[in-house]
Amino acid sequence: MELLEAAITVLREEGEPLHWTKIQDLALRRGYIDPFETPDVRKHLLAALAGGVRSGALVKISKGVYECAG
């Protein structure tokens, strides 16, 4: 699963805006992200979240807090 897809899945499942650290924690715990497949998960997840905001898939609510668009 791609990092943006994992983040969107977590946000949809939780149904509320979440801080990126909570998104990362839940995605790792649920097995959506494999830390052995993606080195430096933090850096790549933050880049994926920024890309999601640019593409319109996510909305940045406040510093580090995201929700699904629409």
Label each PLM-derived region with a short phrase.
Residues 1-6, 14, 18-21, 26-70:
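Charged low-complexity interaction tracts in eukaryotic proteins
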